[in-house]
């Protein structure tokens, strides 16, 4: 357990939830004892509760919990991982450490027993959980001895009686917070990808008529998870799992061994296992798969129909209809568990009474860290539990022991083979993982289940006949509206007579139809975002501003008095640069003040004296407590604070030098803190596994941005086993300083781009990273390898070739040569980029910008061409770069869209609301419709308004209570009139009040430090790279001029060129 890291904040939060549940159920105390690990049952509630509270399983450990106390009894080795829980809240958490001394351990249990009997005679425990081991034996011995003593006494007032804690644990773990839901969502995605993998393998086996048993196919599916890259082999896996930034396949494991059934023997219980009988490729194949991620379970099951009969199809269609009825009408907040089952039975009796006796004994169960919560089953017996918003349910329904006799009699071929006999009995099963919300439920295992998607026909004659039957059946099933629309379309396409007299009227009609279609798509996209928001968040994600507590810095000038420099004996002001300390003479003694305690200062002269005033940080000293800034002191009634001190001296120059030294020391301290924060997310990559000799693929004569050194030096880009290496070529053999290396691992590449040199001056390969790396002294999310596309041209006026050319033949030849050279460069770089993608074994996909879809905009300081790709919106030519991942976008908002303006702004809001929004300003209004069409095509919801919005305040409001934000309609407010920046600024200015409590000079320079130390949370580029490189590459680009200056230059250039 060397890498155990327990989240203290999460522990206190979940402990509080469990304590409230104990109080609600009138259980005064609870004892959870875990002995030796057992592989027979991994879902014991005692172990599940440990995982929920601590994130890990602690064997040979007891946890005693009351409404005010939590006591751990464990070994010394495990106590090291729990010690920080007692340090932060010693009144709440206690740690009793066991040793090798048997008597000491016995006294701990006796002390625990006395504590329990003193509080109450009743205590809660998980009655079903049975553990073995020395730890359990010692506790049972103490408990039995106490019971024997109580039985011998005439009064038995102190005898402990145990009540079952299973329901209490289930209630505490039922509602999932956002982190738990994210883990469940990843687990659901993994189950969907594994089901898709099974379908591909199953189809190959059935089509090729391979001989394999159900259990053998189960083992094949189960073994796939051993390879951490298994999900990269399918497109669905790349979309659902690879796109998740923090996904780690190491945390994936099976909830149960996959269940595959075929050939007429079916068991719809969750305890079923795959049999050793052959996989029969006719009739029905059932597959159930459940994966869990970080211990959070998911479940999915599908029925696959192979050459089905009409009765099979009819019964399966009803199963789909039944699931839709349950999801739409029964899986809602507040519905009792038994009502879900009873209403389902009533619906079957009404619609298909012949199937009632074949229906499963329940409709599913509560899902979480425990795969199947036995206290919350959706059946007729569970009368005391209700569905609640935030719960995750495994909805499992099906029909078993169905007979297929009637359709077999109608078959043309009366000779029944063995396979046809197996088709006599079949079963249907459908399982999905669903989240309960206030309104409609959220489907987490979104995998195809329509009959057309799960039906397979390997008989050509039957397939042809069935297609004809389907076509005949579909025509009468069309609604009147569909028929009318079809007739209208046919009439429009087959006639040459125009309905309007003018061409532009037809164009306007087409535009109107396109706009209407786009609006319909947008309505669906907005509804989808709303449902996703309700699924992602719960009431537990709300944060109260009153709960904010400042973060206090830990610093120390000197541990011992002897460390103070000897030079302070002259009782002057000294600056200790090494320990970042100001030493002031007070009452004849040197008193150290760390530079972090210094706030601001001022220097002025009055008569013959020079006054130096130093202001120090202290709680409530005119600071803005709403800002999450780090404060150097902790406010406590036991602490005394020096707010300011004034020192007078006749030596003016000495005071000037001291004041300057203090200011410089403070600036250096602020700069170090800022650099430390910027480098907080920089990772140390794993080692590059190098290839040797001819196996190394190389691209010579390339340059890198950002450059490791100040000089621009060419180098070679190499492909190795697990990443790329750029190595610069030294200008001379003795100059080893210029031999710079930059390694980029495939696992850290989020996007790989190749941009050709058409209409550009460079051809490039660009790597956008998941986590930043250091190149030289810079932190960067973007690494680019490029080569200039055009060489310097020379005018050969006096050359011998000149006399053979006439007119502009030399210029034409140069242009042809340049086009040829660019084509060769594009081919070389594209081929190498494809090699990179192939060498990554599916970890990286190559993406190429679509220049024809590009639009001009200002993402940072200058106008550039922003170009869409398959997965992103990029600008890769001029730093700072822009890389916006489309999959991460929550909504796109168009600002300043109003009549009379020549341009508009585009704002991207990310699904991770902690990321700053990305602005692309000054887009020409002529491209408005093109931008809207592109955003709609990539499934991004759009909103628009006439004003610029204050996104800092909007995102703070959303983060305060995201669940309530989506309950209130989510992003629907963006379609209305937003407040302008000027209105927001006027509101902020109106809140200003002059304070007379503190002197004027106190905040003058602290504001200067604050401007360096603090930056607006939403005013910069995206720190994780979704918004581009940001300020990492500022040194590579010149600051842009304002628009007035550019217009004056353009007008001057027009006059000089002779244009009016």
From Swiss-Prot:
The name under which this protein is listed is FACT complex subunit SPT16
Sorted alphabetically, which SUPFAM superfamilies does this protein's record hold? Creatinase/aminopeptidase
SMART domains per UniProt:
FACT-Spt16_Nlob, Rtt106, SPT16
Cite the PANTHER family for this sequence. CDC68 RELATED (PTHR13980), FACT COMPLEX SUBUNIT SPT16 (PTHR13980:SF15)
Which regions are flagged for Basic and acidic residues bias?
A: 1045-1060
Q: Which UniProt keywords apply?
A: Chromosome, Coiled coil, DNA damage, DNA repair, DNA replication, Nucleus, Transcription, Transcription regulation
**Which compartment or compartments is the protein found in?**
Nucleus; Chromosome
What domain of life is recorded for the organism? Eukaryota
GO molecular function list? histone binding; histone chaperone activity; nucleosome binding
A single GO cellular-component term from the record reads:
transcription elongation factor complex
Q: Where is the composition biased (Acidic residues)?
A: 979-990, 997-1044
Q: What does this protein do?
A: Component of the FACT complex, a general chromatin factor that acts to reorganize nucleosomes. The FACT complex is involved in multiple processes that require DNA as a template such as mRNA elongation, DNA replication and DNA repair. During transcription elongation the FACT complex acts as a histone chaperone that both destabilizes and restores nucleosomal structure.
Q: Which GO terms describe its biological process?
A: constitutive heterochromatin formation; DNA repair; DNA-templated DNA replication; nucleosome assembly; positive regulation of RNA polymerase II transcription preinitiation complex assembly; regulation of DNA-templated transcription elongation; regulation of sister chromatid cohesion; transcription elongation by RNA polymerase II
**Which organism encodes this protein?**
Candida albicans (strain SC5314 / ATCC MYA-2876)
**Subunit comment:** Forms a stable heterodimer with POB3. The SPT16-POB3 dimer weakly associates with multiple molecules of NHP6 to form the FACT complex.
Residue spans of biased composition, Polar residues class: 478-490
User: Coiled-coil annotation: which residues?
Assistant: 508-532
Question: What are the start and end residues of every segment in region (Disordered)?
Answer: 458-490, 977-1060
- UniProt family annotation: Belongs to the peptidase M24 family. SPT16 subfamily.
